[in-house]
Amino acid sequence: WINSGKVNDYRIIEPSEYITELGLEKSSTKLLPKRTTVIAITGATLGKISLLEIDCCANQSIVGIVENNIFKGEYIYFWMKNIINRLIAWQTGGAQQHVNKDNVNKVNILIPNEKILQKYYIQVRPMFNKISSNCFENKNLQRLRDLLLPKLMSGEIRVPINSKVLISKNN
């Protein structure tokens, strides 16, 4: 389960919280597959766009655009980045501005010919895969830091000081 605050993340690699199978069945939410482009349509995150790197559900303040055989996540993500200001211009509501889900559904999408689209995917997909890999690696490094730092600060783990390591390469 992700809330709209998660859309601030460049890539969504973990949920805000977890939902049970029963919770999924009893609610109106749908499971969004990995590589879905998500857009925050209300509140402080209005207009923020992210890409799911996991399967997850979202609350009603998020719209998901699922890739298909023609339009992959890489294309949808950048197309939505390109037109988001138009969507925001259509916002409605008094107290809390929001973009109507129907307006998202009405957005026209540029359809390049298949050859151009395939060339685009060949160029962009490796970069998207690397970004995804880096996001997961960063999260693992953060967890490792959070595990080790308190132990280092308390003295539970000691780092041996090797004089050879401390010598500058410039000396």
Task: Report residues per predicted region.
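Amphipathic alpha-helical coiled-coil/heptad-repeat segments
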Residues: 70-71, 75-78, 82-97, 102-171
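Sequence-specific dsDNA recognition surfaces
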Residues: 3-34, 53, 58
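Glycine- and aromatic-enriched periplasmic loops at the membrane-periplasm interface
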Residues: 60-62
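Conserved catalytic-core motifs characterized by acidic clusters
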Residues: 14-15, 49, 95-98
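Short, Lys/Arg- and Gly-enriched loop/turn segments at beta-strand edges
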Residues: 46-52
